[in-house]
C-alpha cells in the first residue's frame, strides 16, 4: 500500500514556526553525531524539522506563530537576525582574507573566534525546544547543534595541524552559505514577508552545499586521524580506576562510517521536501 503525503506550502510552514530551531538538518545539517553533517541536514536543509512537523499551508504557519506569543516571536526574530548577521560577518571575513592573502592558509585562525561564538550560541536552539517556543524535539535539536559543535571544538579547534587543510575551507563555505540562507529564511518567515528568492535558495542551494559540506567534514576528520592516533588525544586507556576505555581514533572512524548510510537517505529525503515546497507535488511513498 502507498501513503499519500500532501505537499508543504510555499510560505515556509513548519520551518517558520521552528525558526530559531535547528538544525537537520545535516545536516546538515550539519556536522552531526554520529554522522556529523549528515543527520543535521535532515532537518536544517529541508526545513521540515527532520519531518517532525510540516505545515499544510501558510495559514497553519500563521496560526502556529500566534500561539508562540508576542514575546517569543520577538525573541525568535531577534535571534535569527543576529545569527544571519553573524554568519554574514563570517562570509565577509573569509572573502576579505582570501582577497588580501591570496591563500586559504591561516583562514581558519583568522575567523575562528567568530565561528566558535556563533556556532556555540546555537545552543540556545536546544533551550528554545525545552521551553516550547519551537516545535522541534529536544533530541533532534540536541543532535543537530552538538554535532556542529563537535566538528568545531573537538576536531578543528583541538587538532591544530589540520586547520590549514583545504577541506576545512570546504565545510566552512558550505556552512556559511547554508546558515545565511537558513536564518534569513526563518527571519522573513516570522515577519510574514518571505521573498521568493530566499525560499528558492533555501530549497535549492543544499543540492550543492550539502555534498560539499559533507565532503569537507569527512576529509577534515580523515586528515585528523594520524595526529589523533599518534597522540592518543581524548582517549582513555586501561587500566584506570574507573575500568573504562575510550579510543578517540576509532570513534572518529565510526563517525566517518556513519555517513555511508545516512548521506544518501537524507539527501534524497531533502530532494523530496524540495519538490513538495517549490512545486506543490503530492509524493507517494511506498511502505515496505
Curated annotation (Swiss-Prot):
Membrane protein topology class: Multi-pass membrane protein
InterPro entries: Tyr_Pase-like_PTPLA (IPR007482)
Record's protein name: Very-long-chain (3R)-3-hydroxyacyl-CoA dehydratase 1
EC number: 4.2.1.134
Gene Ontology molecular functions: enzyme binding; very-long-chain (3R)-3-hydroxyacyl-CoA dehydratase activity
Residue span of region Disordered: 1-59
Reactions the enzyme catalyzes: a very-long-chain (3R)-3-hydroxyacyl-CoA = a very-long-chain (2E)-enoyl-CoA + H2O; (3R)-hydroxyhexadecanoyl-CoA = (2E)-hexadecenoyl-CoA + H2O; (3R)-hydroxyoctadecanoyl-CoA = (2E)-octadecenoyl-CoA + H2O; (3R)-hydroxyeicosanoyl-CoA = (2E)-eicosenoyl-CoA + H2O
UniProt record similarity statement: Belongs to the very long-chain fatty acids dehydratase HACD family.
Any one cellular-component term (Gene Ontology): endoplasmic reticulum
GO biological process: fatty acid elongation; sphingolipid biosynthetic process; very long-chain fatty acid biosynthetic process
Gene, per the UniProt record: HACD1
Subunit structure: May interact with enzymes of the ELO family (including ELOVL1); with those enzymes that mediate condensation, the first of the four steps of the reaction cycle responsible for fatty acids elongation, may be part of a larger fatty acids elongase complex. Interacts with TECR.
Record topology, Lumenal segments: 96-114, 160-165, 222-251
Active site positions, chain numbering: 210, 217
UniProt pathway annotation: Lipid metabolism; fatty acid biosynthesis
Residues glycosylated per entry: 243
PTM comment, free text: N-glycosylated.
Residues spanning the membrane: 76-95, 115-131, 142-159, 166-180, 204-221, 252-269
Keywords per UniProt: Developmental protein, Endoplasmic reticulum, Fatty acid biosynthesis, Fatty acid metabolism, Glycoprotein, Lipid biosynthesis, Lipid metabolism, Lyase, Membrane, Transmembrane, Transmembrane helix
Organism annotation: Ovis aries (Sheep)
Expression tissues: Expressed in heart.
